[in-house]
Amino acid sequence: MRQESMKKAFSNRRMEGLSAQAVCLALRGVALRGVVLRGAVLSGVVPVGLALLGLALLGAVPLRAQISLATVVDLAQQNSSSVKLAEADTRKARAILTEMNDVYIPNLDIGSSIGPPTIGFPAGQPSIANATMSSLVFSFSQGFYIKAARAAYKAASLALKDAREQTALDASTTYIELDTVERERDEASQQQTDANRLEEIEQARAEAGVDSHSDLLQSRLTLAELHLKQLHLASRAAVLRAELASMTGLPVASIHPLHSSIPAIPAVTGQATGQATETPGLAAANASAQSRLMQAKGDAQVNHRPLITFGAQYNRDSNSLNNYSTYYQHFKADNFSIGVTIQIPIFDLIHRDKARESAADALRTRVEAEQASRQNDLQIATLDASLGELSALTDIAQLKQEIAHEQLKEVQSELQYGNGSSADPGASPQVTPKALQLALIDEQSKAMDAAESEFDLCKARLSLLRALGHMEDWLKTLGPATLVGQPTGQPTATAIPSPAP
């Protein structure tokens, strides 16, 4: 029953593709066979003229491409600034982790100290070429620093996943809302036609003295209110298209939703499982807190613990550039040294203060992670409580739509066959065309209310999926990105499917 009422709203869209096909087939037949007009076979000018006329009619048909929800989500994630920033943070965290591990690998530097001879005692080695190597051998703090960098990289990766899910949620919600508004605009357009017909009927009845002038004014008020509703829906659709264009980078005029690409949204509840939920955002906060904790432990291990480093140096010296032989009897050209350095900080107030600072940062990030977890639990409870109310409102709106549809069928039947009552004074009055137009307008209003209630329910369900950490599971049901039809201005005969009941 609901599907029948929704099909009427999309009849104009489906006729676009069918009209294009009919014109193409007619033109093909005219071009091949010619036209017989008044007994004369016209095979020259008339087929060409009709072909040009048909092409003009075909160009007037508003053909457009439709973009699937999967395409919108994919483009939004690629174009999102928050996702790009999260990707940059992930690459930075990965580089820091690599840096923490590479301190154990000796580095190699080469250089030269060529210059004129010094005056008096030589101030430096007359080095033609030199090479130095150094690395960390052992540190009590470095192990904690590596763990901190690994946890920070995990936090950045989870934050990237969280940013992608949030972008997908925003794009999906906007896309579904635009699809709902487009369906409501179709209903409003039909309402406008019925309201115009109602005004014509009231005008005739008022002129005939059947209805009062106030009834005519009421019909005009209804027409004005429906016109205002159309303007509101048009502006709302324009804003939603602009939002999707900003998210995806697509032209505004190319964004037309494909209703069949929207998968069903599962009716989950916050009490479905008694286990604690952890979204990518919460997991990222916990990983960040763990990273700060490891950083604080590493800073606390600096004082009173040995630090061992490795070093090696080679010099190729020359006496012709300096007067080394005057002061050093056993001067050699090639010199090499290697060894380790052991340092034990006994009294270092700077590192002690740094450890206290890191401990405070670790405590702060831990409290922030716990606060985010509590806020997420509160959001789940709020959404779970509102879902029951929204579901009930959706059921009521659908029942009202079904009742209005049944009442419309009754009016149509009585208008066609009569209500079976006599012309007695106490008998029920016969149904008039005015009642039919009012029933049509009411049925379309109830259909729009039902579509709006269903969108509110879908939006709440998506938000709950996100809060429960199941957003990725729903995104997997979107399927591949698709583009149905061709851009506006390119002829095509793609039919627009009917919406799901």
For the regions a protein language model found, what residue spans apply to each?
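Sec/Tat signal peptide C-region and signal peptidase I cleavage site
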Residues: V61-A65
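Sec/SRP-type N-terminal targeting helices
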Residues: K84-A88, N101-I105, V137-R164, S214, ...
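Acidic, low-complexity, intrinsically disordered peripheral segments
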Residues: Y417, S421-S428, D442-P501
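N-terminal secretory signal peptides that target proteins for export/translocation
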Residues: M1-G39
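Periplasmic alpha-helical coiled-coil/stalk elements that build and connect Gram-negative outer-membrane
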Residues: K8, Q166-A283, L383-L390, E410, ...
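A small-residue-enriched
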Residues: T71-F138, L250, G274-K354, L378, ...
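Bacterial N-terminal signal peptides
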Residues: A26, A31, V36, A40-A60
